[in-house]
């Protein structure tokens, strides 16, 4: 029974792409920055071949890699979660999703006010924790919604759970999602509930993403159409708006995501288990916390042998990322335009170097190839590529 476990280490870039400067990113390298932390330890991924990947100049190379290893190029125009995951699944995005460094236009906000019956606060790029510190009191006093964005293509709505019940906040996000289409089709509308008293507001785990519907067929659609199981762990369900997915489970962070992965390794199914581990990006990358990022990578690396021990003879483990988020890059707090790693491990895989690939979509093509499915998108399998 063939199974693929595809794990996305959210934001784990391995060095700037040639066009990074066009995205405002100069000398960015998530792996390079994190490797300088005293908490950096990736012995198991080293054994797989992480430091043997083209262009990786940190860490110790291994003479006997246990996995196939590849440097992946993002072909799409962008560096965000949505576009990165879409490309992994086969969608090329020739234009970046819209961003709003000066806030959202008045016509968008006016329609939002009319349809929700609530006014808005802020309307500018802001740190998620700082925005509730700065606007939380006024929100609690007036009931106005805190609307803000970031360097990414997002429309975020923060509201205190005692002022706006979470389900109502989700309804407001659905309204925003309906409004934000076409020219203003942001990648994600995000609910950001919070609790607490003045001066001590904290965000709750009940965040929810309302993504743009994928504009073309994906690897997930093809697997589901072929009768395979497509299991989503973490925010994969939201990124693809449930399309092409047969079962999903949300997680509260990396530790739970890894535990859910171990549980699915022990279940019987045929198809794909697609996992997103978000803490690298959400807790450490954007917050520019090098040591926190390093510790989170070390934790995953420590769990790798357990994951591998639960694999069956026809299982393939794939590890990659969707973009970079260099925690040492201080010009912005946003994502960084980087190459990503791709490690492929299991009995059906011949270890070795697969070079540098021209698109993340080669990952989707590789998954489909393993199940004998011809991709309905541009992408080439590296499953049978000659290792060098």
Q: Where are the model-predicted features located?
A:
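Feature captures the catalytic ectodomains and active-site-proximal regions of enzymes
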Residues: 1-388
């Amino acid at each position: 029974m063939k199974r693929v476990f595809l794990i996305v280490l959210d934001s784990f870039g391995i060095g700037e792409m040639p066009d990074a400067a066009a995205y405002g990113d100069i000398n960015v390298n998530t792996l390079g920055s994190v490797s300088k932390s005293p908490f950096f330890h990736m012995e198991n991924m080293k054994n797989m071949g992480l430091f043997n990947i083209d262009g990786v100049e940190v860490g110790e190379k291994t003479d006997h890699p246990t996995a196939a290893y590849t440097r992946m190029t993002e072909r799409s125009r962008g560096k965000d979660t949505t576009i990165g995951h879409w490309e992994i699944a086969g969608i090329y995005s020739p234009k970046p999703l819209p961003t709003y460094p000066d806030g959202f236009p008045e016509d968008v906000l006016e329609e939002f006010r009319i349809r929700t019956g609530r006014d808005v606060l802020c309307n500018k790029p802001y740190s998620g924790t700082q925005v509730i510190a700065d606007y939380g009191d006024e929100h609690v006093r007036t009931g106005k919604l805190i609307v803000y964005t970031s360097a990414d293509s997002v429309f975020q709505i923060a509201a205190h759970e005692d002022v706006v019940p979470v389900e109502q906040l989700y309804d407001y996000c659905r309204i925003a999602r309906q409004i934000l289409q076409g020219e203003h089709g942001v990648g994600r509308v995000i609910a950001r509930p919070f609790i607490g008293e003045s001066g001590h507001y904290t965000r709750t785990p009940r965040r929810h993403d309302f993504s743009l519907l994928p504009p073309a067929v994906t690897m997930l659609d093809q697997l589901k159409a072929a009768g395979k199981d497509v299991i989503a762990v973490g925010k994969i369900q939201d990124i693809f708006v449930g399309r092409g997915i047969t079962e999903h489970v949300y997680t509260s962070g990396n530790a739970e995501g890894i535990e859910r992965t171990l549980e699915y390794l022990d279940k019987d199914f045929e198809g794909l288990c697609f996992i997103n581990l978000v803490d690298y990006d959400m807790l450490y990358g954007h917050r520019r916390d090098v040591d926190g990022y390093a510790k989170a990578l070390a934790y995953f690396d420590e769990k790798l042998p357990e994951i591998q021990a639960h694999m069956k003879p026809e299982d393939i483990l794939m590890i990659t990322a969707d973009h970079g988020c260099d925690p040492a890059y201080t010009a912005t707090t946003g994502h960084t335009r980087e190459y990503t790693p791709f490690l492929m491990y299991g009995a059906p895989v011949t270890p070795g170097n697969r070079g540098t690939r021209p698109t993340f979509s080669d990952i989707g093509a590789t998954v489909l190839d393993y199940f004998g499915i011809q991709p309905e998108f541009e992408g080439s399998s590296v499953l049978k590529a000659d290792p060098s």
